[in-house]
């Protein structure tokens, strides 16, 4: 992460639990209009079939026009991610690339994406949030169901989402000039901020 350019297009941070520790990894995505009848899908560090499923769900259920796009995804540093908690940041990276819109450099995300584009809770949410806060991150996109009982570190905004479309709309602005996450932000005491 020390070499990470802040606010990169097509890059999102994913807190991944490996054994007894949480790691913050950068997932990267590049979308490009395909010149082929069957657009290419390339997965480095993530399961290829998972990428196919996430691209299909994002296209069909969340309105991302990915069907005519080549999609290349990568986990920086040569890491491999096998847990579904990286689903949400991976799709956010794809949306960022598709709309050519950088994600907030202080934002991280986690959550499993279901076939209906619902965002499902994953285990060890507290560990993920605590590790990200320790590294100075200030904004978290996570499953709404994970907010219950979660201790949000002081100075961090947690944005609970139910659907993939809601998550994308919260962080990727198609006009590239408006940060939508403020509309949905939760303060540590759980009070909804005015939008």
Q: For the regions a protein language model found, what residue spans apply to each?
A:
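Peripheral, non-AAA+ core regions of ATP-driven protein-machinery
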Residues: 1-195
